[in-house]
Amino acid sequence: MIGNDRWVTEIETGPVTEARPDTNAREPGDRTPAAPPAATPAATTDQLPEDRYLNRELSWLEFNARVLALAADDSMPLLERAKFLAIFASNLDEFYMVRVAGLKRRDQMGLSALSADGLTPREQLGRIGEQTQRIASRHARVFRDSVLPALGEEGIYVVTWADLDQAEREQLSTYFHEQVFPVLTPLAVDPAHPFPFVSGLSLNLAVTVRQPEDGGQHFARVKVPDNVDRFVELGGTDTDGAEGAAVHRFLPVEELIAAFLPVLFPGMEIVEHHAFRITRNADFEVEEDRDEDLLQALERELARRRFGSPVRLEVADDMTEGMLELLLRELDVHPGDVIEVPGLLDLSSLWQIYGLDRPALKDRTFVPATHPAFAERETPKSIFATLREGDVLVHHPYYSFSTSVQRFIEQAAADPNVLAIKQTLYRTSGDSPIVRALIDAAEAGKQVVALVEIKARFDEQANIRWARALEQAGVHVAYGIVGLKTHCKTALVVRREGPVIRRYCHIGTGNYNSKTARLYEDVGLLTAAPDIGADLTDLFNSLTGYSRKLSYRNLLVAPHGIRAGIIERVEREVAAHLEHGPQAGKGHIRLKMNALVDEQVIDALYRASQVGVRIEVVVRGICALRPGAEGFSENITARSILGRFLEHSRILHFRAIDEFWIGSADMMHRNLDRRVEVMAQVKDPRLTAQLDDLFESALDPATRCWELGPDGQWTASPQEGRTVRDHQVSLMERHRSP
């Protein structure tokens, strides 16, 4: 996990794949099971132009630019704007650690395979560098020129050393000598002291000192400690802030250290000092050997991660040319990987400012409602009794996760009639009540199976800890299938009811994480349907045993079923559209997801558009599809909704064939070829009506969003002067607890 919040947690990272001409190409030594052949297309791709795809890396940068647009929006609560500045920064860190690192590896290996839009790895790196410099500079300016002055108007100041009076400097001198100086280690560079290792994402001061005797100059590096606050608060605040709020004055800790460099280098003259920060390659893959303990292999690779090669160097834009040249040489960084920042580096630290107790400067508190099916009554029913009466669709965070999905697992753990609980865990919270319930169930003698995905990027250490805690409690812990990540969100409860064994299920789009469930928009299906129960039984058997199950009754399961299943449904939609006549306009596909990249799925949508099927895509992040282009995508629109909550659900609707699907898979190579993913059909008309309503709200012409044009540019919509509604606010008002 990077930063204090994974608001944009799934930033579409993963191994950089060769996209053309073989979208299923694998690297030498890759033991990932081969993906099945694609469904037979209704028409050949010869009818589609070569330039039909947008670049996925540049599309991701456009997504992060939309996050930045939220920070620049002065109609947003002020501390929420600071939060989005922090999110932008941590997003970009992760993008460089994984996506850019993967492209660099391919370039260095001489792999010349083109991306789907026809660019070599080197060409993509060049464009990424140019675009990153633009948006990183804008990011710094939004903070410096807009958010920072606005914070000052509210009595929240981020000051410089020059702004301080003598009393404040004396106060900070005491703090420095007591709290900071003991943990600083100045590292000189000379023939006896090689250039020190600089850890990834650490903030550092590059210092030049001069010897008074002979004028000789030397370089030294001082690491800014990460165990002290980035922003040091000055004491003695008053209440002269807006509406009587306390005044807060903060000094960046690197400024404090810089002010006391003479203490670190006594007897030396400080010539210059500049902040810098490097990002290292974190794009490693665990070599999975059937004869080796996966936990040990992963821990070995995690230890190596911190020593990855540098992929980005961030410097203050006033760094001297000589200092920059020294850093480039010693850190072995290409000049094209330098990002010059006009202001403070590493604004992910703004989470500290966001944490101030200033509710008037934040979004209004929202308390999720309990789903009506699970509402407390005079004689409360168990969730099992409720599900026997019919399926329930929960929409988080508008409906509470803790009183629905979490309670489902907790009731199962406490119910003496429950025989077994089986669940997948991809990312979970540090004090997870779900994991606690599984441990309680195992200690009570139930059969508990947890499929823990310990390879979930940047959450590996946390998942290893939970895996060991579960094992110690007697839970049967499995790590899935060699070569695949288990990303599906599924839970199965087996319960004895008299002479009958009944299975209860949950299939969702989001993680079993009670904290992110308050921040991420997701949907989940709770059901006692026998066919889904049988399907999940087969799925868990394949994950824990040697089953080679490839087909299911009511599920689509990757890596062998989702791509082909979706393309088949697109083609059935085309057939139904043509059967009723294009004039009837019956063909209509609506898709909501985090990312749309897979070329085979995109081509199927293009072919559907060419015969008149209307296609509406709501995509939060990457979109490689080019909508609205003459000749192949005139009938396709794509929009992106960003806001208070991370839009995370994956929902598919094929109107002519009357099918709704939800699940964990985005339309990306990694999800469809290298992960275990599950999509489930929602059949109950009561629930499909809820999904239809969700689409209607998201696709309302008045909904605030960004719309994608055929040129790859995202434009804010509706245009100024038009009526605007906020999709998420509308849903909050509808679900707000009394």
UniProtKB/Swiss-Prot annotation:
Active site as annotated: 487
Modifications after synthesis and translation: An intermediate of this reaction is the autophosphorylated ppk in which a phosphate is covalently linked to a histidine residue through a N-P bond.
Residues annotated to bind ATP: 91, 520, 620, 648
Keywords in alphabetical order: ATP-binding, Kinase, Magnesium, Metal-binding, Nucleotide-binding, Phosphoprotein, Transferase
CC cofactor: Mg(2+)
GO BP terms, alphabetized: polyphosphate biosynthetic process
InterPro entries reported in the protein's UniProt record: PP_kinase, PP_kinase_C_1, PP_kinase_middle, PP_kinase_middle_dom_sf, PPK_C_dom2, PPK_N_dom, PPK_N_dom_sf
Region of interest: Disordered: 1-48
Alphabetical list of PANTHER family matching this protein: POLYPHOSPHATE KINASE
Family indicated by similarity: Belongs to the polyphosphate kinase 1 (PPK1) family.
HAMAP family hit by this protein: Polyphosphate_kinase (MF_00347)
Protein known as: Polyphosphate kinase
Organism (species): Mycobacterium marinum (strain ATCC BAA-535 / M)
Name of the encoding gene: ppk
